[in-house]
Amino acid sequence: MRPSNALITPEGYPFIAYSAGLFLFLAGGAVLLKSVALAVPAAVTLLLVLFVISFFRNPERMPPADTALLVAPADGTVVYVGPATQEHLGACQKISIFMSVFNVHVNRAPISGTVVDRFYKQGKFYDARHADASCENEQCGLVMEQDNGVRVAFVQIAGLIARRILCYAEVGDRLERGQRYGMIRFGSRVDVYLPEGLESLVTVGQTTVAGETALVRLG
């Protein structure tokens, strides 16, 4: 497991370095040459630097005290709540969360337990807000089992802009609820598959906070 507790994820360091270097080059040229033509792109590049820093932010999160609550694995907006079929769980419930480029993109474990399966599927890069993204897009998923035997699957899905899924958890790893386990660059979706019969605590259109927003109560 590689996830860091740093305020900025290490995955963002190269992007920050490149954009900051470009800004310094343009800003330095604008000052030395007294060039408005360089000052304008320098200002635009500074905005890019700030955006990149914001995208790779990695804030601390505090899961709810009630350990029976399954929490959101991603920041974003709920785009689907309803029945589904998942190859590892069979008939189940699904809650889908869409992450825009302005959301925190660090993903967190929704429950405490052991990773019992990991799967990857190559695919398309459709808009992650669309239902077809769950089946057609590139994705990486984990199946976790709680100590009481309850299993939950959650799947990182690439989107129209997001083209890189990072998942550091492996089969056999023990994850705690709210623990960082990966991220997706740059705008994407996470689907959570749950046992049937659970009452959803969120609705379509609701905003979620990874590691804090309760999606359902397990048991």
From Swiss-Prot:
Binds 1 pyruvoyl group covalently per subunit. It is a peripheral membrane protein. Pathway: Phospholipid metabolism; phosphatidylethanolamine biosynthesis; phosphatidylethanolamine from CDP-diacylglycerol: step 2/2. Keywords: Cell membrane, Decarboxylase, Lipid biosynthesis, Lipid metabolism, Lyase, Membrane, Phospholipid biosynthesis, Phospholipid metabolism, Pyruvate, Zymogen. The active site is at 188 (schiff-base intermediate with substrate). Its main location: membrane. Catalyzes the formation of phosphatidylethanolamine (PtdEtn) from phosphatidylserine (PtdSer). Belongs to the phosphatidylserine decarboxylase family. PSD-A subfamily. This is Phosphatidylserine decarboxylase proenzyme.
